[in-house]
């Protein structure tokens, strides 16, 4: 994957799957950091689905996987990841989609991920605290949130956040 991400003529999209047997929440966060370090073009994080007729579904009990009997048959819990941890993974997926996977905010988000291993935890806690993690947000709203978060928690990135804002075509009057 490192090789593919390093190719200059293509963008690599990497997928992580929460709810796989033996996969812990802390490993998901580590894998996001690793993929950010590879400069993956997008990092997708989804929950495992146990579709009828699949080997994984047949072995669910043996593997310690509890899943919804209704479509989309998402994993609800495993021996390694609790219900609340899967909820955290879902919220991390929203964070990645809204910030890392958005070209305007990707460079800054990647740098924050790589330079502070607690960034994802802190930013996720902030987005949850201000009730925004599950809200649809415009590009501008996400930029304002990232700028304010940097201003409060990472002042050394405030200028970079302002530059990303300008490069995204936003007015400085709104910062």
Could you tell me what each predicted segment is?
Residues 91-175:
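Radical SAM enzyme core and accessory elements
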Residues 1-117:
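A structural motif corresponding to the C-terminal lobe/cap of the Radical SAM core domain
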